[in-house]
UniProtKB/Swiss-Prot annotation:
GO terms for molecular function: ATP binding; thymidine kinase activity; zinc ion binding. Belongs to the thymidine kinase family. This is Thymidine kinase. InterPro entries: P-loop_NTPase (IPR027417), Thymidine_kinase (IPR001267). Keywords: ATP-binding, Cytoplasm, DNA synthesis, Kinase, Metal-binding, Nucleotide-binding, Transferase, Zinc. It catalyses: thymidine + ATP = dTMP + ADP + H(+). Its main location: cytoplasm. GO terms for biological process: DNA biosynthetic process; thymidine metabolic process. ATP binds at residues 23-30, 95-98. SUPFAM superfamilies: Glucocorticoid receptor-like (DNA-binding domain), P-loop containing nucleoside triphosphate hydrolases. Homotetramer.
Length: 204
């Protein structure tokens, strides 16, 4: 009986891909990114990790999750630098992708076309529930999109939205639970509605 021996190395050609992990704040996006990158390192693949220089909430260089799990990364000012620093790697990880410029979409495409596995995590919506930065374009070109959810702090259901609890109209405002809360659709609408004031009718 003849047996066909599987070639674990598959082709000699590397197969690139783009994986996007998206969701609201406190949904575990960075945790999932770190999990995938650690598995790649265990498999002895070369990994480079990038984050925007603006993200200094926990550490100036490391990618750090809300649970304080961390992995060393290279902070970069713009997406073009990712291409320059990603030569001869198997996997590229990118955290807080929403803070990058729109050029990140083309950067991810080029890396994947070169045979690199690109794993990206970021907020898909801002606090107004509007598409955030390059995330819509990244989701469009991705080979796989994983939408993760937080838990609504008001009712306990799955949360998809990041509700800002402090004043400010600017789209980018770094913060934690004191500034943002994950909410479901119903609770987001309730918290976004102006408080109802009881109308008082005076009688003469």
């Amino acid at each position: 009986m003849d047996y066909e021996i599987e070639n674990n190395h598959a082709d000699s050609i590397r197969r690139g891909s783009i994986e996007v992990i998206c969701g609201s704040m406190f949904s575990g996006k960075t945790e999932e990114l770190l999990r995938r990158l650690r598995r790649a390192k265990i498999a002895r693949q070369t990994v480079e990790i990038f984050k925007p220089t603006i993200d200094i909430r926990y550490d100036e260089t490391d990618v750090v999750s809300h649970d304080k799990n961390a992995i060393a990364s290279a902070p970069v000012d713009n997406s073009a630098n990712i291409l320059l620093l990603s030569s001869q790697v198997d996997v590229v990880g990118i955290d807080e992708a929403q803070f990058f410029d729109e050029g990140l979409v083309e950067v991810a495409q080029q890396l994947a076309d070169q045979g690199v596995r690109v794993v990206i995590a970021g907020l898909d919506m801002d606090f107004r529930r509007q598409p955030f930065g390059p995330m819509p374009g990244l989701c469009a070109i991705a080979d796989s999109v994983t939408k993760v959810h937080a838990v609504c702090v008001e009712c306990g259901r799955l949360a998809s939205y990041s509700f800002r609890r402090v004043q400010g109209d600017q789209q980018v405002m770094l913060g934690e639970l004191n500034e943002y809360s994950p909410l479901c659709r119903t609770c987001y609408r309730k918290c976004s509605s102006p408080p109802q004031t009881e109308e008082i009718h005076s009688t003469i």
